Amino acid sequence: MRQLSALMILVVMLSLVMMPALSEAEGMKTIYFAGGCFWGVEHMMALVPGVKDAVSGYANGTVDNPDYRQVVSGSTGHRETVKVTYDPSLVTLSELTELYFSSIDPTVKNRQGNDIGSQYQTGIYYDNEAGGDVIRGLADQEKQKHSAFEVEIKPLDNFWNAEDY
C-alpha cells in the first residue's frame, strides 16, 4: 500500500512539473522562411524576442529526409528553410515577415548574395490558411516596392531538419 501511495504521489508530482511545459507549447505558432543560406536566417530569427525556436532544414522537396549533398545537387527541389516557432503574444507573424523581407533581396530567383542554386530560392511556407492570408497581404505590399518579386508564397508541403554541423 505504501508503494502504491508513493507511486501515486510521484505521478501527481510529475504531472504538475510537466503541466507548465505543455501549456507553454499551447498557443505557439510556426512559420517557415527560406532566405538563402539557412544559417543567417536561423541566427537572425533566434535573436527576436518571442521566438522560441529557429531550426534549419529543408522544405517542400520531393525526397524524404534529404541530406545537404542531395539538396545542394538541385535534384530534390528543397529550399534551405528555417522553421520558426514563436509566441504570437510577444511577436506577430507580420513582424517576423517584415523582418524577413528586410533581410533578403526579393527580386532574384535561386540566389541570395553569393549563394546560388535552387536550394537558395526565397520563400515563405505556412502551415495554416490564416497565416497564408497575412503573408500574401504583406507580399502584395512588398511587390509594389520592386520591379520584380521572386519570393515563393506557398503552403508547407514538408520540412526536414538539417544535419548538425
Please name every model-derived segment.
Residues 7-18:
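Bacterial N-terminal signal peptides
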Residues 16-165:
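Flexible coil/turn and secondary-structure edge motifs
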